[in-house]
């Protein structure tokens, strides 16, 4: 059997991808489409981890003078002989990524931008030896290598590089700017947004508007920033967002591409799982998967077929927008709470989406937060109903898990503020007052989002209520609470050792799909008895065990109690 190609986890260099024999999902049709559409300045916005940086590297590798044509052998674009003859390896390219332009202060971030320019100038170091550049040109180029770049030089740096490259190669220049919006996002987080907007606007205006050496430019980012903030005065400026049909297959993996990848690695039987967890993003007219998720899942399961799916995407960001959104849902926003509950449970909401906000506006209102959730990939569209109004859903199980985890996290933070109620609930359990505990637990459930999605399996629903219960019990002092502890013939949901007391508690949580809470409680009590969950407590010296069954359905619950003495 031939050796399989390596999976490209974290590989963003097209050249490395091809030379080192990584598995590559062919996106070179983007080159053909770009040239056919022909925009002078083109901005593509997609959520994180959808292959933007790799695509930009592919453009640079294709267009730049001295390109290795063999890297495109067997790929889609190699079939278009006319384009290859006219464009492959024919143009100077300025290519930068603003991903690392960050800092606690404006000066720190500015210094990062200077380093980005320095790095690109060093990559184009051959300009300093060019016989076609004057001494003045070369002195100007030396300034682009300086770590102490003046403001005027920094603002015109990409323009100057373009002009010098055109002089040297006698060809117009292609400009590629990856992650264009990262400096703005970081500036907004750290309090120097206005200064950074001014700097980025000056750099972009010079290179994209007043640049006679420009062939065309491509920019990528996560969000479409209001044109008035940094793209002022650009006339031939095209934006392709997640709602646009043009270029809809160029970012992310299509269903056919995922099937082919899984088949190549012998993972065909995992298709339905991968689809449930990582598909569902709607770009234009196409449903796509998150490449980062698919590749990581495939890699993990080549090593261990029995591994459960993971939330890979969540680890690539702080997920701040979800935290802000859920945290903003207070009593005045009861409708928003119901809408989020509907989404978590597999439904949809209709919202007006604004794609022309500044970073300052992203979190300024509930309406803007809906738009931000959509543009950053936490929600996706199932179609637009009228103008900018879209039918929004959670794309897949991974994102639903991320949102649910944040709901539970904030629920626990709220619980922490009310120690009196925590004590009341725990005391009710300890003093065998099941009816009081039932009322208090019902009150807790009214304040959070319930999981009743018909597409979510019963154990997943039970895990959610289990999480709520653990959130409450975890704040009770002197209680040793263990979850899914091995005991008897199986695993109890929750087991509690109450300080120095000779009383222990076993809790089994069930979800009543049909709403019959009492029947589900009886099943839970029988399960505790049949599997010997209490045995471990007796082995620890406990003489009395309180066996609680808690059945939940939507926001309703039933608690039943049986006691047992050793």
At which residue positions do the language-model features occur?
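Structural signature of nuclease core domains in nucleic-acid processing machines
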Residues: 434-566
């Amino acid at each position: 059997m031939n050796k399989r190609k390596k999976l490209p986890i974290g590989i963003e260099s097209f050249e490395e991808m091809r030379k080192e024999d990584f598995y590559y999902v062919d996106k070179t049709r983007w080159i053909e489409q770009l040239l056919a559409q022909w925009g002078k300045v083109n901005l593509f916005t997609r959520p994180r981890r959808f292959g933007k940086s790799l695509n930009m590297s592919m453009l640079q590798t294709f267009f730049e003078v001295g390109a290795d044509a063999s890297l495109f052998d067997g790929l889609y674009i190699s079939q278009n002989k006319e384009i290859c003859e006219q464009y492959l390896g024919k143009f100077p390219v300025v290519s930068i990524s603003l991903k690392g332009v960050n800092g606690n202060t404006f000066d720190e971030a500015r210094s990062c931008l200077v380093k980005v320019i320095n790095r690109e100038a060093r990559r184009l170091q051959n300009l300093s030896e060019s016989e076609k550049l004057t001494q003045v040109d070369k002195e100007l180029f030396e300034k682009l290598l300086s770590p102490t770049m003046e403001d005027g030089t920094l603002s015109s740096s990409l323009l100057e590089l373009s002009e010098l490259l055109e002089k040297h190669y006698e060809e117009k220049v292609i400009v590629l700017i990856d992650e264009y919006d990262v400096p703005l996002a970081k500036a907004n987080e750290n309090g120097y947004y206005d200064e950074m907007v001014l700097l980025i606007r000056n750099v972009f205006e010079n290179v994209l508007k007043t640049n006679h050496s420009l062939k065309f430019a491509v920019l990528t980012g996560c969000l479409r920033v209001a044109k008035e903030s940094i793209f002022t005065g650009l006339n031939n400026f095209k934006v392709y967002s997640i709602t646009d049909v043009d270029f809809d297959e160029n970012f992310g993996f299509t269903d056919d591409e995922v099937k082919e990848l899984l088949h190549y690695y012998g993972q065909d039987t995992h298709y339905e799982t991968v689809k449930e967890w990582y598909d569902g993003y709607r770009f234009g007219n196409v449903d796509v998967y998150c490449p980062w998720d698919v590749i990581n899942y495939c890699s993990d399961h080549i090593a261990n077929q029995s591994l459960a799916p993971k939330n890979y995407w969540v680890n690539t960001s702080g997920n701040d927008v979800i935290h802000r959104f859920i945290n903003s849902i207070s009593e005045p926003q009861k409708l928003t709470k119901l809408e989020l509950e509907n989404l978590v449970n597999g439904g949809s909401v209709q919202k007006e989406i604004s794609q022309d906000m500044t970073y300052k506006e992203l979190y300024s209102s509930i309406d803007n937060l809906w738009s931000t959730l959509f543009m950053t990939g936490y929600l996706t569209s199932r179609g637009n109903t009228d103008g900018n109004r879209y039918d929004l859903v959670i794309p897949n199980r991974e994102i639903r898990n991320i949102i649910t985890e944040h709901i539970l996290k904030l629920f626990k933070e709220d619980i922490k503020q009310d120690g009196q109620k925590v004590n009341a609930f725990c005391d009710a359990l300890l003093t065998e007052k099941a009816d009081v505990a039932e009322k208090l637990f019902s009150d807790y459930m009214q304040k959070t989002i319930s999981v009743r999605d018909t597409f979510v399996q019963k154990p997943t629903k039970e895990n959610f209520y289990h999480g709520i219960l653990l959130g409450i019990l975890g704040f009770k002092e002197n209680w040793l609470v263990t979850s899914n502890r091995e005991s008897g013939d199986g695993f109890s949901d929750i087991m509690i050792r109450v300080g120095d007391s000779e009383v222990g508690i076993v809790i089994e949580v069930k979800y009543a799909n049909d709403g019959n809470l009492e029947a589900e409680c009886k099943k839970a009590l029988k399960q505790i008895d049949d599997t010997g969950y209490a045995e471990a407590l007796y082995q620890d010296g406990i003489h009395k065990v309180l066996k609680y069954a808690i059945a939940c359905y939507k926001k309703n619950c039933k608690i039943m109690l049986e006691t047992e003495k050793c």
